[in-house]
């Protein structure tokens, strides 16, 4: 079973930190996959811009996330989405690859910013949506519509990251326990 979790939040809100804490709670296996001690739950991380970043690197992008580079990545993702829905197809391929491991239940964290893309992932992959909020970054300057439109979606869950790492770890533990529940939506291949 694969439970897809769409994660969003403004730059610097702690999305990656939250995801990594969730991995650590489920026992770290590698930098991208975390298994629980009983080996019945695994966590994998990806983003709708992973493939976009690969293409950007081929075009000379140096991997930095300046305002100009964030705008470039956002625009490139928009082009790939309009052309052939490439970012969604790459996420769907990832989910279907995880479906082959029937001995383990997966939580796949997918970082995604655009409300329309979030809704598409939610509908097509039966995903749960999570917003990470951190007050100190909510009014920072952004360079692109993807970062600016973070709050224009009604998320299933909101996690507040306004305190210290211990508080965020507690929120991550609660989240993992919630995701273990059977009634949480999961992906079912239509084939």
Q: Which ranges hold each PLM region?
A:
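Extreme N-terminal starter segment of soluble prokaryotic enzymes
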Residues: 1-5, 43
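Hydrophobic anchor at the beta1->P-loop junction of P-loop NTPases
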Residues: 7, 109
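Small-molecule kinase domains that catalyze NTP-dependent phosphoryl transfer to phosphate-bearing small molecules
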Residues: 11, 123-124, 128-191
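Conserved lysine of the Walker
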Residues: 15
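Hydrophobic positions on the alpha1 helix immediately C-terminal to the Walker A/P-loop
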Residues: 18
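Conserved phosphoryl-transfer catalytic core
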Residues: 23-40
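ATP-dependent small-molecule kinase phosphotransfer cores
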Residues: 35-105, 113
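Surface-exposed amphipathic alpha-helices with a cationic face
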Residues: 99, 119-123
């Amino acid at each position: 079973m694969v439970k897809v979790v769409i994660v969003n939040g403004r730059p610097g809100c702690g999305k990656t930190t939250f995801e990594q804490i969730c991995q650590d709670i489920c026992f770290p296996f590698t930098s991208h996959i975390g298994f629980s001690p009983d080996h019945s739950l695994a966590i994998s991380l990806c983003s709708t811009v992973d493939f976009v970043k690969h293409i950007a690197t081929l075009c000379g992008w140096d991997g930095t996330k300046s305002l100009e580079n964030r705008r470039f990545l956002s625009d490139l993702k928009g082009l790939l989405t309009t052309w052939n829905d490439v970012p969604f197809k790459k996420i769907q391929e990832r989910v279907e690859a995880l479906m082959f491991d029937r001995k383990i239940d997966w939580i796949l964290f997918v970082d995604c910013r655009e409300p329309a893309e979030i809704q598409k992932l939610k509908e097509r992959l039966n995903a749960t949506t999570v917003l990470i909020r951190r007050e100190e970054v909510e009014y920072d300057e952004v360079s692109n519509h993807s970062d600016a439109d973070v709050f224009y979606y009604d998320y299933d869950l909101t996690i507040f990251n306004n305190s210290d790492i211990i508080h965020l770890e507690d929120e991550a533990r609660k989240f993992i326990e919630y995701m273990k529940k059977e009634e949480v939506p999961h992906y079912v291949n239509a084939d």
